[in-house]
Regions:
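Residues that define the transmembrane beta-barrel architecture of outer-membrane proteins
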Residues: 3-5, 80-84, 135-139, 152, ...
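Residues embedded in well-ordered secondary-structure elements
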Residues: 12, 77, 89, 130-132, ...
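Conserved beta-strand->loop/alpha-helix structural units within folded catalytic cores of enzymes
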Residues: 13, 17, 87, 141, ...
Length: 204
């Protein structure tokens, strides 16, 4: 089991009709709260006595091979535990809006992947501390214009995500028994570069 605790704050401030400031901050503390125990089976679903393929006398019998992941207290990986954003929306003309948001994430930890080389029957695998991924951030730009087409209201939206084409690490994996560092992680996933989207919405 994993324990997920944290606090989150959102705010919106509109001093005048045409200007809006908004933001959010989320701070979490996610750790594995218990160890995990599993049992070995072959591809036919039969319980194994050992890793050489010997079939045990029964499921969860005394000779059914097992392994324990000693992971209690280790940080949960795969998702940033601190996220925040701050942005502005400006409406200079009737129906027109544009906005700019700064989005940041931190305290993101690498995930681990268990392979057959980590296992031995009836033993405990000590899960090492994951790599703390450097924080990342990007700017997102958006604009919209509302108007009428033959008496029908329509809105044209455009977005440029990651406006400055900034790359940062979003996810990574490290060996389950080796303390995670930048030079021993693998399967590193980076953020998307600059992307664009345009959408037309018509309300009938």
């Amino acid at each position: 089991d994993a324990r997920h605790m944290g606090v989150e704050m959102n705010f919106t401030y509109r001093p005048v009709k045409w200007f809006e400031l908004e933001g959010m901050l989320s701070v979490g503390d996610w750790v594995w709260d218990s160890n995990a125990k599993g049992y070995f089976y072959n591809q036919n679903g039969e319980p194994l006595k050992d890793l050489r393929g010997t079939v045990a006398s029964g499921i969860l019998a005394d000779d059914h091979a097992w392994a324990v992941l000693n992971q209690k207290g280790v940080k949960v990986g795969g998702s940033a535990q601190t996220t925040g954003s701050i942005g502005i929306n400006i409406r200079p003309l009737d129906g027109f809006r544009f906005g700019l948001d700064w989005v940041a994430s931190g305290r993101n930890y690498s995930d681990y992947q268990v392979s057959s080389s980590n296992y031995s029957a009836n033993s405990t695998i000590n899960v090492a501390d994951p790599w703390r991924i450097p924080w990342g951030n990007q700017f997102d730009f958006s604009a919209s214009y509302s108007f009428k087409i033959a008496g029908v209201r329509a809105t044209l939206n455009g977005n440029i995500n990651n406006l400055f084409n900034h790359y940062y690490v979003m996810d990574a994996y490290n060996n389950i028994t080796t303390a995670g560092e930048w030079d021993n992680v693998y399967r590193v996933f980076y953020s998307f570069g600059r992307t664009y989207s345009v959408r037309l919405k018509v309300n009938f």
